[in-house]
């Protein structure tokens, strides 16, 4: 049965978060018969299947569960979802998001029957007065121009660009890639600030900033595909301070071996100044409680090495000159 809107949600083994998202979709001020929800699990996931089945039995949502045969990432999950969807419009959100009750109604009222159009809604990230570094970074989604936590495309628009690029295997840069390909094809992206999705920050363990660095490899892929757009909208130049910090560490060790004390102290001093600036930047808008400060200091020592490693790994993997 054809629908006005299909909501596609990628997920994997996060039933409690998914449950809250589905509760908000069940509260939509939009005719229940006019939209469907497609939950796509990034790999076999019995507990997610049971969650979706329980919702289906309530009759509060027209909802389907689709599992990928193996873990392939959210881009692949979204592709599976929209290709199985019956909606004229495909709305994307995430399992840790809470769509506003007027979300779908706002989207449909903005749609004028165009075959090729996309919409970008507004993201709200609730924060405590002094957030952690991780919380502050997530809050930058509020400034993003186009994110998959709250975006909509017509089926024809998605089909014209073949959906998401599944080489983006983690939740990183696949939304910018979709945006850039829409722009490349001349498909308009309309800002829709009245279409609101709240994105609470989920709990993260100690040192999450270290694990996040792996995503940097996909910067190289996006840069290879869209060098001009990448430099215009993502990052104008490499993070040279990280490279200088690593160089200083190498010079310091070499100077110690050569017993060049002045050179060693100079390299150590430059490294310490750059490290201090990096720590200051991360603490400028975040919590100053000692456990958080300790985490910031320790992870700031390691982040430059991990960031450069994963950026260069991506450059080699995707065969592009990228720093």
Language model region names:
Residues 68-85, 145-149:
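Glycine-rich, basic loop-to-helix element that forms the pyrophosphate-binding segment
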Residues 1-27:
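N-proximal low-complexity "stem/linker" segments adjacent to membrane-targeting elements
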Residues 98-131, 200:
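Conserved donor NDP-sugar-binding/catalytic core segment of glycosyltransferases
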Residues 90:
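Short aromatic/hydrophobic "clamp" motif used to bind/position activated sugar donors
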Residues 170, 176-231:
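Catalytic donor/gating beta->alpha subdomain of glycosyltransferases that bind UDP-sugars
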Residues 3-6, 36, 41, 177:
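Cell-envelope/extracellular polymer assembly enzymes that use nucleotide-activated donors
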Residues 245-318:
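Membrane-embedded multi-pass helical conduit in multi-pass membrane proteins
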Residues 23-67:
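Acidic donor-binding segment of Leloir-type glycosyltransferases
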């Amino acid at each position: 049965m054809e629908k006005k809107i299909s909501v596609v949600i990628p997920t994997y083994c996060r039933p409690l978060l998914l449950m809250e998202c589905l509760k908000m979709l069940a509260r939509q001020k939009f005719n229940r018969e006019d939209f469907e929800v497609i939950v796509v699990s990034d790999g076999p996931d019995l507990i997610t299947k049971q969650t979706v089945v329980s919702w289906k039995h309530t009759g509060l949502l027209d909802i389907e569960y689709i599992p990928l045969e193996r873990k392939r990432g959210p881009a692949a999950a979204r592709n599976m979802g929209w290709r199985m969807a019956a909606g004229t419009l495909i709305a994307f959100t995430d399992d840790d998001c809470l769509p506003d009750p007027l979300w779908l109604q706002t989207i449909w009222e903005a749609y004028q029957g165009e075959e090729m159009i996309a919409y970008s809604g507004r993201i709200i990230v609730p924060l405590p007065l002094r957030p952690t570094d991780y919380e502050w970074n997530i809050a930058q989604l509020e400034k993003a121009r186009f994110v998959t936590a709250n975006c909509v495309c017509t089926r024809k628009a998605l089909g014209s660009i073949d959906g998401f690029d599944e080489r983006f295997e983690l939740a990183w840069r696949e939304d910018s890639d979709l945006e850039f390909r829409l722009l490349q094809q001349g498909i308009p992206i309309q800002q829709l600030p009245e279409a609101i999705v709240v994105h609470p920050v989920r709990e993260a363990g100690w040192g999450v900033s270290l694990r996040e660095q792996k995503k940097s490899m996909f910067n190289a892929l996006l840069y290879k595909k869209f060098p001009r757009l990448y430099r215009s909208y993502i990052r104008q130049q490499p993070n040279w301070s990280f490279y200088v910090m690593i160089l200083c560490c190498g010079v310091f060790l070499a100077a110690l071996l050569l017993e060049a004390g002045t050179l060693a102290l100079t390299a150590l001093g430059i490294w310490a100044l750059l490290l201090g600036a990096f720590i200051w930047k991360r603490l400028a808008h975040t919590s100053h409680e000692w456990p958080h400060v300790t985490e910031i200091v320790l992870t700031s020592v390691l982040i430059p090495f991990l960031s450069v490693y994963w950026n260069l790994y991506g450059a080699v993997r995707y065969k592009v000159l990228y720093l």
